[in-house]
Amino acid sequence: MKITEIREITIPISSPIRNAYIDFSKMTLSLVAVMTDVVRDGNPVVGYGFNSNGRYGQGKLMRERFIPRVLEANPDSLIDDSGKNLDPHKIWNAMFTNEKPGGHGERSVAIGTIDMAVWDAVAKIEGKPLFQLLADRYGDGKPNRKIFVYAAGGYYYPGQDHGKLKDEMRSYIDRGYTVVKK
């Protein structure tokens, strides 16, 4: 069992919206695919990850530092103790080799995007949704089905006036949200 390839692409976010800090039409997003030699339903298992909007894609960091470290590591060193799956913590440690400790933002985005794809692959190899895998590994096996969520909105669209913004916020409340982040 091993990671056979990690692909990354950085693309522009095609959105005309902005908030008080960020014009999303100028932002980029990184997408990552972690390919494995594990086959499920006749296809290789592939885990996917992406960085959130509001953060620039970090493809250069991934391609120059973090992806090579994972692919150059001994594949056996990235397997969990059962020998049946990848170990996200060992993969994270491989990515963090020769890095100064700390949570520098751009680096965190790069590592976090790959880490998301690794966890997706691990859950697929295990044959479980990620939320169940996490509940099994780090909880009592019973996922909490009640999760706090909020509506994110209030972005400035070209031509949007305060009336439309008010209508948008009201629509979130009408749909049952109790908290709106703008």
Task: Mark where each language-model region is.
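Metal- or metallocofactor-binding catalytic centers and their adjacent structured scaffolds
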Residues: V39-I125
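Broad gene-expression machinery/nucleic-acid interaction feature
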Residues: L29-L31, T113, K146, V179
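A short, structural micro-pattern
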Residues: K26-T28, R63, P143
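Metal-dependent enolase-superfamily TIM-barrel catalytic cores that perform enediolate-based chemistry
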Residues: D140-K182
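Glycine-rich, aromatic-flanked loop segments that form ligand/cofactor-binding clefts
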Residues: V109, D115-P158
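Short regulatory "switch" loops immediately downstream of catalytic or recognition motifs
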Residues: I13, T28-R40, V46, P68-I79, ...
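Structured loop/turn residues at beta-strand edges in well-structured enzyme cores
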Residues: M1, G112, R175
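Structured beta-strand/loop patches that form or line metal/cofactor-binding pockets in enzymes
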Residues: M1-R55, G59
